[in-house]
Regions:
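Active-site entrance/lid segments in N-terminal catalytic domains of soluble metabolic enzymes
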Residues: 1-226
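Residue-level detector of alpha-helix initiation sites
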Residues: 25, 237-238
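Conserved active-site-proximal phosphate/metal-binding subdomains
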Residues: 30, 88-110, 212, 217-232, ...
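Acidic, glycine-rich active-site loops and adjacent beta-strand->loop/helix elements
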Residues: 74, 204-205, 236-237, 259-260
């Protein structure tokens, strides 16, 4: 048998499996590898500046002639950056300086972990944290990314967070398929009303920003709410059995991220990939310590320190600015126990660092075996 659903026809692909647009990890090399293997590769462009996104799109087109997508964030609650660029300009104080207790907390954490001192405001700007992290999570940059997606006539666009409704008409005019990632039935209904082509039902099991509702419970409810709009299941799907289960729940394919994090082509460091291979099903935690919004990430001392403190994380983008120096210092020292990385509960199924095509092929073969065996659970008429 072969896996084929409406998703294949809508995206122009052979297999109804989509690489989730994971920031940093889902780079042109990984996206192209998944597309070349018959699935749909999606660039994780949340932290790309518009000009960098343009380069990523062009690089992906050099690596594949098959359909691919771009995933960005469209959060409604992000504050607008002040005139002059960046969430904190040269004349505006940093969030850490506005809230000295947060700076003190972070400074003590860095010293305790042997990560050096918390950078001064001038150092932060010199190293790009104030500009890069502050401006990246701004309304202006999100809108700039969308203009590049439209300019480049990307085959598929996915809103990893937020409602793409205001952009649907312009995207459709380009022939772009529009995908909306949702974590609640009400969001699915709103996405349908907005005219999206595909919905991703992303449950609590997923890495990154996700839903408070588990994947098994969320998917069928979103399928019912979506009507004729096809649904991809996401969250904790790490092998072919998960894909088969998603299809049985009414989804027409799977949106898979963490299973590809240890792919040879993935844009994360080797020490991070090795940590994923060694992880188990209990290796993740929900935390607001990185972006200010709830997200599932690999257990680490930064998230634990926030959980044990009396502080409420700052709103986006200020929490990212505060966490930036910690992440950068931890990555320089290759401290996977400190540097937070997004990942889902399916990481316990990651067994080795392998090519993306091999991972995809194994998932497909596993799904086919599972579906072929499903009739055996039915009782005979006699």
């Amino acid at each position: 048998m072969s896996l084929h659903t409406r998703i294949c026809d809508i995206f122009g692909i052979e297999i109804p499996i989509v690489l989730a647009g994971m920031g940093g990890a889902s780079n042109p090399e990984l996206a192209a590898a998944v597309s070349n293997a018959g699935g749909l590769g999606v660039l994780g462009a949340a932290t790309c500046r518009p000009d960098e996104l343009r380069e990523w799109i062009q690089r992906t087109r050099e690596l594949t002639d098959r359909p691919f997508g771009v995933d960005t964030l469209l959060p409604a609650s992000v504050r607008k950056a002040p005139a002059g660029g960046g969430a904190a300009s040269a004349t505006s104080p940093s969030p850490a300086d506005q809230l000295p207790e947060f700076k003190r907390f972070t400074t003590e954490f860095m010293e305790r972990e042997g990560l050096g001192e918390f950078p001064s405001e001038d150092d932060l700007r010199k190293k790009g944290f104030m500009e890069d992290l502050g401006a990246l999570f701004s309304k202006e940059v999100f809108e700039g990314q969308m203009e590049v997606v439209i300019e480049q006539k990307v085959p598929v666009y996915a809103a990893g967070l937020g409602n793409p409704g205001p952009w649907v008409d312009r995207l459709h005019a380009n022939g772009t398929v529009v995908v909306s990632v949702v974590g609640a039935v009400r969001h699915a209904r709103k996405a349908v009303e907005s005219g999206v082509d595909v919905i991703v039902a992303q449950g609590h099991d997923a890495g990154g920003h996700n839903s408070p509702v588990g994947t098994m419970a969320l998917v069928p409810q979103v399928v019912d709410a979506a009507g004729d709009v096809p649904v991809l299941a996401a969250g904790g799907i790490g092998d072919g059995r998960g894909v088969a289960a998603a299809l049985m729940l009414g989804a027409e394919g799977a949106w898979i991220g963490s299973a590809f994090l240890a792919a040879e082509e993935a844009g994360i460091e080797d020490y991070q990939k090795k940590a994923l291979v060694e992880a188990n099903e209990e290796g993740t935690v929900i935390s607001r310590s990185v972006t200010g919004k709830p997200a599932r990430l690999i257990r680490n001392s930064w998230a634990r320190a926030w959980e044990e403190s009396d502080f409420e994380p700052l709103p986006m983008p200020f929490q990212s600015i505060l966490a930036g120096p910690v992440q950068a210092a931890a990555m320089r020292q290759k401290r996977g126990d400190v540097a937070p990385g997004f990942a889902g509960q399916g990481i316990g199924m990651i067994e080795a660092i392998r090519p993306a095509a091999e991972i995809l092929r194994e998932i497909v073969e596993g799904a086919e075996r599972t579906l072929e065996g499903a009739p055996g659970f039915q009782r005979g008429a006699g």
